[in-house]
Amino acid sequence: MITLKRAKFGFVEIMEYTSIGESCSVVSGGTPSRSKNEYWENGNIPWIKIGNIKSKYVNEYDELITEQGLNNSSAKLLKKGTILYTIFATLGEVGILDIEACTNQAIAGINITDSRITTDYLYYYLKSKKDYVNNIGRGVAQNNINLTTLKNFEIPLINVDKQLNIVEILEKVERMICLKEKEIDDLDLLIKA
C-alpha cells in the first residue's frame, strides 16, 4: 500500500507500507495437555511463556516439553530469529528468539518473508507500538488481540540501509539507558550504605 504523507515545507512524501500479514508468516503457540506426563517429563524442547520475554533476545525458559507434547498439541517449533509478540494478557511485549523453542498460546511467532524488512527493524517498530496495541486490545477478563489484528499491523517500508541506521541509533540509546539505570542503582546502594 502507498500513502501520501505531508512532509516539512509543504512537500508531499510518498510512503510505502506493507502489513505483517503480507510480509511475514505468523503463528500462535500452544500448550500441551498438563494431564499428560509424557508431554512434559524428560522434555528437551524449550517452552517459552510471557514471563520469559525480558530482553531483546529470548533464550531463557522455565519448562521443557517433549517431542510427543509438540506433536499432540497446537504448539509449534519456532526457529532461532523468530520475533515473539505477546497477544494475550500482557500485550505488546517483543523479543527475538535466540534459540529454537515453542511458545504458549499467548505469544505469536513472526517470521519475516519479505527481504525489504530486517528483523531488528521490525522488532523496534513493534516495540514502539506497545501503547497502540494496549489501546486496541479487548477482552472481558484480560486484554488480547487476535492473529488477524496482528497481521493487519502496517509497517512503513524504508530502504534497508535506513532501517539499519535506525536500529544502530536505537541500540545506542538502549545502551545509554542501561548505563544510566545502573548508575542510579549504584547511587541507591551508596545512599543505603
Region spans (language model):
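Non-catalytic DNA-recognition/assembly elements of restriction-modification systems
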Residues: 1-30, 55, 152-160, 164-167, ...
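A generic structural signal for residues embedded in beta-strands
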Residues: 85-86
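Histidine kinase transmitter module recognition
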Residues: 113, 125, 176-179, 183
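A specific heptad-register position in long alpha-helical coiled-coils used by two-component signaling proteins
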Residues: 171-174
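DNA target-recognition patches
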Residues: 17, 21-24, 34-69
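Basic, amphipathic alpha-helical recognition segments used for DNA target recognition
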Residues: 18-25, 54-60, 76-80, 96-102, ...
